[in-house]
């Protein structure tokens, strides 16, 4: 079973029902709910989601939404090792590198993000948009 790491923007699409992104992000999430993939996110993802969503839907709704999503998303550990690796990396985006290191520690097969800049390290974990992942998944 594929282990996928969900970047912050994917969970925000669902919590905030952001258009036109909701359908693709929700379809990825549905694969996790139905047990076809295992979904992971880092503690940083959860914090960033609540922080960002509270501005648009309010704090309590942001917490409620994350609680609902957390039933299906495993927490990828982020500790001293991931912080050290991110600090020693030569990438230009520290937060993306932290996320990448959390995904690597959780042995994720890929990262799903809508981040078009994709400043993640290029060391082996594929980076895909929700649409790319869904197309790839349905071709398996």
Model-derived segments and their meaning:
Residues 1-41, 54-61, 128-140:
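Short, well-structured N-terminal submotif of metal-dependent ribonuclease cores
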Residues 3, 72, 104-140:
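Acidic, PIN/NYN-like endoribonuclease modules and their adjacent C-terminal/linker elements
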Residues 9, 27, 44, 81, ...:
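Active-site phosphate/pyrophosphate-handling residues
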Residues 11, 46, 83, 118-119, ...:
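A generic structural signal for short hydrophobic patches within well-formed alpha-helices
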Residues 26, 36, 44-83:
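Active-site-proximal, substrate-binding regions of enzyme catalytic domains
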Residues 41-43, 113:
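Short beta-strand segments at enzyme active-site cores
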Residues 74-117:
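Active-site neighborhoods of divalent-metal-dependent phosphate/nucleic-acid chemistry enzymes
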